[in-house]
A protein has these predicted regions:
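N-terminal glycine-rich FAD/FM-binding segment characteristic of electron-transfer flavoproteins
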Residues: 1-226
Length: 227
């Protein structure tokens, strides 16, 4: 098949690029190590990806919060339509993706010369972390938009797995009645090694913060077990 090239962008990310180079199936790694990419501001990352992506047939990123932020901008810069959140590849131009909050699966075909795609990572098996020996090429191009600047971030720490990658998810809704009752799920989740999610109703009621919301207006999950 065609070669797979991977872009690693960030600040002080050279070690990550070297680690990615050992992944099976990777032919080349581009390393864009610059403070401009340190906080993944969409304006900066999208310009970088579009500049590199114009020479490729497919530009792919995970359908994470970050990917959903910058990839539509990449598609706009390349003047193509994005194919979002795919769960299967039928051919080089045809893909399957969920629609209507996962109640139906659409098969979509892209006629664009460059396919800009976001992938639901939990729908695909991970490649082996070792077995490859890709070359690493440093990217000197710096895209640093004057229209945005990083102000700060608030990181929520948790020993539980991330919702979007968890194999087991236990979720609560309006029936939990209040935030104190919602905490009853903690013990079950700890026993199962599960992530905890919540419905929009529970979030709107103030039982839990909105980063726990799952579904069409929240985080997309694909666990092996959903309770």
């Amino acid at each position: 098949g065609d070669e797979v090239h991977v872009l690693v962008a960030g600040e002080n990310c050279a070690a990550v690029a070297n680690e990615v180079a050992t992944a099976a199936g990777v032919s080349k790694v581009f390393c864009a190590d610059n403070a401009a990419y340190g906080h993944f501001l969409a304006e900066n990352i999208s310009a970088l990806v579009a500049e590199l992506g114009k020479d490729y047939s497919h530009v792919v990123a995970p359908a994470t919060t970050t990917g959903k932020n910058f990839m539509p901008r990449v598609a706009a810069l390349l003047d193509v339509a994005q194919v979002s959140d795919i769960i299967a590849v039928e051919s080089s131009d045809t893909f399957r993706r969920p629609i209507y909050a996962g109640n139906a699966i659409a098969t979509v075909k892209s006629d664009d010369g460059i396919k800009v795609i976001t992938v639901r990572a939990t729908a695909f098996d991970a490649v082996a972390a070792e077995g490859g020996s890709a070359s690493v090429e440093n990217i000197d191009a710096v895209h640093n938009s004057s229209k945005v600047r990083f102000v700060g971030e608030e990181l929520a720490k948790s020993e539980r797995p991330d919702l979007t990658a968890a194999r087991v998810v236990i979720s609560g809704g309006r029936g939990m009645q209040n935030g104190d009752n919602f905490k009853l799920l903690d013990g079950i989740a700890d026993q199962l090694g599960a992530a905890i999610g919540a419905s929009r109703a529970a979030v709107d009621a103030g039982f839990v913060p909105n980063d726990m919301q799952v579904g069409q207006t929240g985080k997309i999950v694909a666990p092996e077990l959903y309770i």
